[in-house]
Curated annotation (Swiss-Prot):
InterPro entries: Restrct_endonuc-II-like (IPR011335), tRNA_endonuc-like_dom_sf (IPR011856), UPF0102_YraN-like (IPR003509). Pfam families: UPF0102 (PF02021). This is UPF0102 protein Achl_2213. CDD domains: PoNe_Nuclease. It comes from Pseudarthrobacter chlorophenolicus (strain ATCC 700700 / DSM 12829 / CIP 107037 / JCM 12360 / KCTC 9906 / NCIMB 13794 / A6). HAMAP family: UPF0102.
């Protein structure tokens, strides 16, 4: 496995552990379809959480949150809908959370969580939030 892939997997492991400490139930990891991949699918109460995890060794090339823009959020929305269709589930509330992990390998990794960057109900339009 490439170093980049190992770092990404490590970041996802840390993110999953973090989400579990918040009481979320991890339903699936690394779900793929023709549209792309969801890093983590979780349940937070009655909300289905589509979690995007971005991991970096440093901030030299920007904060991990900067790698998740409107196009990526729209794709995650579509992926969440595809995941539900694949399982014949109707989740009234879905949201996208973004988790940033910075781990330079020399100390404690830093995990940051943006909850509800985008969310939608089955009967309402998508609500986009800006974290900038």
């Amino acid at each position: 496995m490439k170093a980049k892939d190992l770092l990404g997997r490590h970041g996802e492991d840390l993110a999953v552990g973090y989400l579990e400490t918040l009481g979320m139930l991890i339903v699936e990891r690394n779900w793929r379809c023709s549209e792309g991949e969801i890093d983590v699918v979780a349940l937070d109460g009655d909300a289905l959480v589509i979690a995007e995890v971005k991991t970096r060794r440093s901030l030299d090339y920007g904060h991990p949150f900067e790698a998740v823009g409107p196009d990526k959020l729209a794709r995650l929305h579509r992926l969440g809908a595809a995941w539900c269709r694949d399982r014949e589930l109707r989740m009234p509330l879905r949201r996208v959370d973004v988790i940033a992990v910075v781990d330079d390998g020399g100390g404690s990794p830093v995990v940051e969580h943006l909850k509800g960057v985008a969310e939608w109900r089955s009967d309402a339009p998508i609500l986009w939030r800006s974290w900038a």
